[in-house]
């Protein structure tokens, strides 16, 4: 995953230096942008060359901040117990292809990179359980939604260890 390697590289850079991160996953754009924002670094942009995405991130301060973990975490078991409750919404922030191959029944898919522009689709009256593959993207999504006043819970460990019913749309 580009973020893990980027974190290691950022620790070796001087403030103001720029790192290029190459990836082929379209979801890496949203992941790196959200991570950079949450750690105080500056996401400069992406250049697409064929199937390769070249992301650029500038180290903004002398010490990289750790991305804060969202304070409210629930387990997969909790989500399974409440998934049919009309006062809850399961929000899957994985990429569309990931969601299509396997997702929690009734979950709504808004990829992390689209969350900011599609936030109006969410109901502020509902408790939103945010899920991704491992809890990293959902953590970033929870921070964004919490800042906008939503009642959110980060689902850990997420789809990587989901043992309950799933749906497939492909």
Q: Predicted regions: what is each one?
A:
Residues 1-13:
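An N-terminal amphipathic alpha-helical segment
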Residues 5, 33-89, 96-127, 136-170:
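Rhodanese-like catalytic fold shared by cysteine-dependent sulfurtransferases
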Residues 10-14, 119-122:
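A short alpha-helix capping/helix-coil boundary motif
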Residues 12-22:
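Short glycine-rich, basic-tinged beta-strand/loop micro-motifs
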Residues 21-31, 37-39:
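Short, structured protein-protein interaction patches enriched in aromatics and acidic/basic residues
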Residues 27, 133-136:
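Residue-level detector of alpha-helix initiation sites
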């Amino acid at each position: 995953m580009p973020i893990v390697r980027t974190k290691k590289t950022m620790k070796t850079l001087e403030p103001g230096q720029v790192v290029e991160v190459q990836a082929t996953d379209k979801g890496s754009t949203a992941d790196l942008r959200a991570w950079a924002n949450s750690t105080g670094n500056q996401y400069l942009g992406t250049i697409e060359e064929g199937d390769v995405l070249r992301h650029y991130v500038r180290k903004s301060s002398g010490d990289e901040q750790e991305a804060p973990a969202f304070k409210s975490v629930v387990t997969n078991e909790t989500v399974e117990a409440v998934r049919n409750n009309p006062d809850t919404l399961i929000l899957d922030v994985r990429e569309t292809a990931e969601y299509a191959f396997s997702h929690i029944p009734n979950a709504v898919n808004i990829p992390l990179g689209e969350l900011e522009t599609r936030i109006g689709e969410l109901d502020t009256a509902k408790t939103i359980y945010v899920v991704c593959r491992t809890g990293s993207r959902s953590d970033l999504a929870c921070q964004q939604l919490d800042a906008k006043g939503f009642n959110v819970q980060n689902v850990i460990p997420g789809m990587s260890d989901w043992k309950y019913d799933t749906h497939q749309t492909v």
